[in-house]
């Protein structure tokens, strides 16, 4: 199930759909991407201009799991749709933590690191 939620999160970013992204990501989530830290709400505002044309998740693994939290790690390969978004393209290690709040799973932490 968390794998599907991660895919939905990436798909909403690809589609520039900040409303769908905000449904999946807690407003106060900690997002650390490309050396930049922001909240889930701040990151959702960036999604409409995210600028990736494709993504592929591989190596998905559950690192830790309880009834209330799940931490995952995977590799995502992204493609940028225009040259000015080239810094968004590449291969990244990603770790995310999801929390079950009142029966709904929401992302509360996400961090990526470019694979060199």
Could you say what each language-model-derived stretch is?
Residues 1-15, 19-23, 28-116:
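A beta-strand edge to alpha-helix "cap/lid" segment located at domain peripheries
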């Amino acid at each position: 199930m968390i794998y599907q939620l991660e895919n939905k999160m990436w798909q909403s970013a690809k589609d520039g759909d900040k409303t769908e992204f905000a449904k999946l990501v807690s407003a106060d989530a900690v997002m650390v991407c490309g050396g930049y830290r922001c909240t889930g709400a701040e990151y959702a505002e960036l999604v409409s201009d995210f600028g990736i044309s494709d993504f592929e998740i591989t190596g998905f693994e559950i690192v830790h799991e309880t009834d209330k939290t799940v931490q995952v790690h995977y590799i995502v390969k992204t493609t940028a749709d225009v040259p000015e978004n080239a810094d968004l393209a590449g291969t990244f290690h990603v770790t995310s933590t999801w929390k079950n709040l009142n029966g709904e799973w929401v992302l509360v932490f996400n961090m990526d690191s470019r694979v060199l």
